[in-house]
Each structure stands twice: as structure tokens, then as C-alpha cells.
Design a protein with these regions (language model features):
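Active-site beta->alpha loop and helix N-cap motifs at the rims of alpha/beta catalytic domains
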Residues: 1-145
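Catalytic alpha/beta core domains of metabolic enzymes, predominantly
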Residues: 124, 128, 139-217
Length: 217
């Protein structure tokens, strides 16, 4: 399982997904990226927005899972993403359930959702997957903090990736509410390096994601 101590043990790298000139997923180039990151001591890889999984073809999803799982070391935690559409994630659930990934991040859907609907949809996906998910909060209207807390208490969430951009990250009423209802040890800063210090020191978040470490771990 993904524990708070595991979240604290490594920066969370968010690598790109390498493709060939014909747009097929590249085994060799992804192996190079993963090996480079691991050589720098990074032990957690999260494949989501930077890997452009919002637009992955359903027909290549199983191949993606095999490649990123097969190229990473035994001590590396690899987390794939699903969605963002409900139908997409439910179709991806069987492949994930058949894999050994301990968790998967649900990419946030923008628009045409309600907080209650998000809770219901993520609950159904978590049950189909059979394991807790990563709740990715990117926009204030996506899910209310209290509903996020309900998901956590239900056991359906491994951790929360918080990524609402603020002009001043120290002034964040949503995050103020979130850490009141969810243990901050289960929340990571998910916007890169710039707000990470404030998120770690002021809000006591467990860790942070980084794209830069994919270049210079």
C-alpha cells in the first residue's frame, strides 16, 4: 500500500511518455527516462498530465501499463493515471485490476460534473479497480473538501494530489479547508517546485511532484 512514509521518502517525478516517430509508445526511450530518474535516487513515478494520458488511445492502454511497470526497478513505485472521462476510466479498470499497481490516479474532469457526481464516479471506479485511488484536485469546483474527506474515510483514496494554482500559494482558502478535514500526511503538493516549500512548511503536506527531476534528478 501507499503509506505517508512512502510519500515522504521520495520526490514524486512526473515523467513524459516517449513515443516513436510513428507515435507508438517507445519501450527503449521510456526505459532510458526511467533509468535516468532512478539513477538520481527518485523512487516514485507518476504518469499523468506530463505523459499526456488525457489523450491516450484506449487500445494502447494495456501496452502502456506493461511498459512502465516492466522498465521500472523493483523498489520504484509507479503510478499510472486513468480517465478523465467516467466511461474511459471504467473501461481501463479491468487492465489495472489485472496489474500489480497499488494505486492509480484519476485525471480530473473539467466541466459537466458536480462534487457529488465526482464522489459517486470515483467510488465506482475504485470498487472496479479493487484498490485505493489517487484523488487529483486541480480546480476549486471539482470536489468539495468535505466530499474529498468522505472518499478518504471510505478507504477509496491512497492520497490526494493537490494542484490548484494560486497567485500566492500561502493564501489558499480551499487548501485551508482541505487540511482541516483530511490528514495532511495524505496530501501532496502537485504543481511542481514553486509552491512546494509553502505547501510543505505552512500546510504540512507530505511531499511534492516535480517535472524538473525528470531532467536533473
Amino acid at each position: 500500500p501507499v503509506t505517508p512514509s512512502l510519500l515522504r521518502s521520495s520526490v514524486i517525478a512526473v515523467p513524459p511518455l516517449a513515443r516513436e516517430a510513428d507515435y507508438q509508445i517507445s519501450d527503449e526511450e521510456n526505459r532510458k527516462i526511467i533509468s535516468h530518474i532512478e539513477a538520481g535516487g527518485i523512487k516514485t513515478l507518476l504518469y499523468g498530465g506530463n505523459a499526456n494520458l488525457y489523450h491516450i488511445r484506449p487500445s494502447e492502454y494495456e501496452s502502456l501499463l506493461k511498459i512502465i511497470a516492466g522498465e521500472a526497478g523493483e523498489d520504484t513505485l509507479v503510478i499510472p493515471a486513468v480517465g478523465p472521462a467516467y466511461g474511459t476510466m471504467m473501461d481501463q479498470a479491468p487492465a489495472l485490476k489485472a496489474s500489480a499497481f497499488p494505486t492509480a490516479m484519476v485525471l480530473p474532469m473539467q466541466g459537466l460534473t458536480t462534487s457529488k457526481g465526482v464522489v459517486d464516479g470515483l467510488t465506482q471506479f475504485a470498487r472496479a479497480f479493487g484498490r485505493p485511488i489517487v484523488l487529483y484536485i486541480k480546480n476549486p469546483g471539482y470536489i468539495e473538501p468535505e466530499d474529498a474527506a468522505r472518499l478518504v474515510k471510505s478507504g477509496h483514496v491512497s492520497f490526494i494530489k493537490y494542484a490548484i494554482v494560486r497567485d500566492d500559494p500561502s493564501e489558499d482558502p480551499y487548501l485551508d479547508r482541505l487540511v482541516q478535514v483530511v490528514d495532511s500526511k495524505l496530501i501532496v503538493s502537485g504543481i511542481g517546485e514553486q509552491p512546494a516549500i509553502v505547501h510543505r512548511e505552512q500546510f504540512k503536506l507530505a511531499g511534492f511532484t516535480s517535472g524538473c527531476v525528470c531532467l536533473n534528478p
